[in-house]
């Protein structure tokens, strides 16, 4: 991946901070919009670096919400392609089933260019200049009640504005079982992370935080039968989601439950979980500021493999919604 970037002239500046082992324990990076707030996680340094103007592009990875959430908190574009669309060579993989490379930029076009470069492919495989209004759907999942008032109002305002500028936006009933995703992903993620780290940490457990030790202990306690059943459930849910999503260029959902929280946490990933579980492509674009003058984002997702359609839809939405400006650095 890095070789592909260098091959097209990218200048690699350095490594950014992540949450500890790309898990729950936050790193020291703060949010450029408010230094008393987190920049999310796990790819917190990448999102903050792009938001602060340190670099125009950055790489991240996502198991659950580690690209979409920090991008939303920092007011930049974050893109997680379909599972398997980008190579994981050289990546520290903790979940074979879920981990995916993603990227951050200040525009949808730039993040599409980044994805093409990482893939070693012509940008035309990812990007289209067609700005025909996309066919959109909007979805309130079972997690809707966890979103604060500002997120709910912002989401409805975004949907209304996009509908006024393009075609009517559908509100389809979600496919059955969608709200099981949280439980299924957690089982797979914890099981695989615990076993991925077992050899490296054996006898050196004190090198990691209590938060991570607890996380890995929970995963180690999951029985093989429960893990295999979770994999089967994932397959069933993904098979139901793909034909449901395919008629639409993108499905609109919230990205986070609220503005960036304080730095002892990386924030709640629940609005990312379903799409990560299904291997669906997801992108977040800045859509407004909340009551604390911190960014809120609009997430768009699509059927697995529909990355190019998703990026085109996101580009149309990006120019239709008002810009949020830059952080007050």
Where would I find each of the regions flagged by the language model?
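Glycine-rich, small-residue loops and helix-cap segments
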Residues: 6-15, 55, 112, 118, ...
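General small-molecule cofactor/ligand-binding pocket signal
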Residues: 13, 126, 168-173, 283
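A short helix-breaking turn/cap at a secondary-structure junction
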Residues: 77-153, 157-158, 321-329
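Short helix-loop capping/hinge segments that flank enzyme active sites or metal/cofactor-binding pockets
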Residues: 133-135, 187-242, 286-297
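Charged, often glycine-rich, active-site loop that binds/positions anionic groups
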Residues: 27-35, 181-196
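Short glycine/serine-rich loop segments
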Residues: 1-115, 278-297
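Conserved hydrophobic/aromatic pocket- or pore-lining residues that grip, position, or stack substrates
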Residues: 5, 27, 162, 197, ...
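Acyltransferase
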Residues: 150-174, 198-203, 227, 231-248
């Amino acid at each position: 991946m890095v070789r592909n970037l260098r091959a097209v002239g990218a200048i690699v500046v350095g490594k950014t901070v992540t949450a500890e082992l790309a898990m729950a324990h936050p790193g020291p990076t703060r949010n450029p919009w408010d230094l008393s707030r987190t920049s999310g996680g796990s790819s917190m340094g990448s999102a903050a670096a792009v938001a602060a103007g340190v670099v125009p592009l950055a790489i991240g990875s996502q198991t659950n919400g580690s690209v979409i959430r920090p991008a939303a908190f920092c007011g930049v574009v974050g893109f997680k392609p379909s599972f398997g669309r980008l190579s994981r060579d050289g990546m520290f993989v903790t979940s074979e089933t879920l981990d995916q490379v993603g990227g951050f930029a200040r525009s949808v076009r730039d993040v599409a260019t980044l994805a093409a470069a990482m893939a070693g492919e012509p940008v035309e495989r990812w990007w289209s200049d067609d700005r025909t209004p996309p066919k959109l759907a909007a979805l309130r999942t079972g997690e809707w009640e966890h979103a604060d008032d500002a997120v709910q109002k912002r989401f409805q305002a975004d949907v209304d504005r996009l509908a006024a500028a393009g075609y009517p936006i559908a509100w389809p009933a979600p496919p059955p079982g969608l709200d099981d995703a949280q439980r299924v992903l957690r089982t797979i993620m914890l099981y695989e992370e615990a076993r991925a780290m077992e050899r490296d940490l054996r006898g050196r457990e004190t090198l990691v935080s209590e938060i991570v030790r607890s996380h890995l202990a929970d995963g180690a306690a999951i029985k093989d039968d429960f893990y295999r059943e979770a994999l089967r459930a994932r397959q069933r849910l993904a098979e139901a989601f793909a034909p449901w999503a395919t008629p639409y260029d993108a499905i609109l959902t919230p990205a986070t439950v609220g503005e960036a929280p304080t730095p002892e946490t990386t924030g709640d990933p629940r609005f990312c979980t379903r799409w990560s579980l299904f291997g669906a492509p997801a992108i977040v674009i800045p859509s407004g500021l909340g009551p604390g003058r911190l960014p809120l984002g609009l997430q768009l997702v699509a059927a697995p493999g529909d990355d190019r359609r998703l990026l085109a839809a996101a580009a149309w939405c990006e120019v239709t919604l008002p810009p949020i400006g830059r952080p007050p650095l």
